[in-house]
Amino acid sequence: YDTDENDQDLTVITNTHDRTGPKGSITITKALDPGNLNMDVGDPTFIFTLTGTDVYGKKHSYEKKVKFTKAEVEKQMKDHPGDLIELSVTFDDLEYGTYTCNEGGMIKYFKLLNITSNSSNATIDQEKETVTFDIGPTGMTAKAQLTGGAKFMNQMIQGSVKLIKKDSKGKSLRNIEFVITSSDGAEVAKAKTDSDGEVTFDGLLPDTYT
């Protein structure tokens, strides 16, 4: 069957996705509270993985990391006292499509508190600890935007130590003071035993305590 573009029975389908247009980008920021940070565990390093499918059906996967060195932490604390410490990465040259970001790394010492975003094309799932973006020109989908961003806020996992004081006969001793010191010799906390001879120190950051 020979076709003619002027044939009224012929339907011509045109792909409206222009590959020559500007591509998308997503910026992810990692935020830490300097008041809840112990650099003795090493430089906190977090890995962000961005996966998605573009409008042509092709799957994509990207990975970037941020590393909080001691020098960087000290600089930010000096320049912006009292503020959160933040580092960002940007995924550039993204084809139009839907992309989801999650994080990894340092799970032994840190937990994710929350994900926030001011981007209208972002959908956050706090339970799954992910954020999804619709990347494309305005109007391509109901939420599409060329750029997007989100912030992952983390907190160091805190532990506790329970101490029990008894005499040689096994009797619980009350009002016995214990002092907890960190690996650098600094006093972290002190408290006295209760009527059961017990004392608990909560809110301890990862470290070696004496």
Regions found by a protein language model. Name each.
Residues 1-210:
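Solvent-exposed loop/turn and edge beta-strand elements of beta-rich ligand-binding domains
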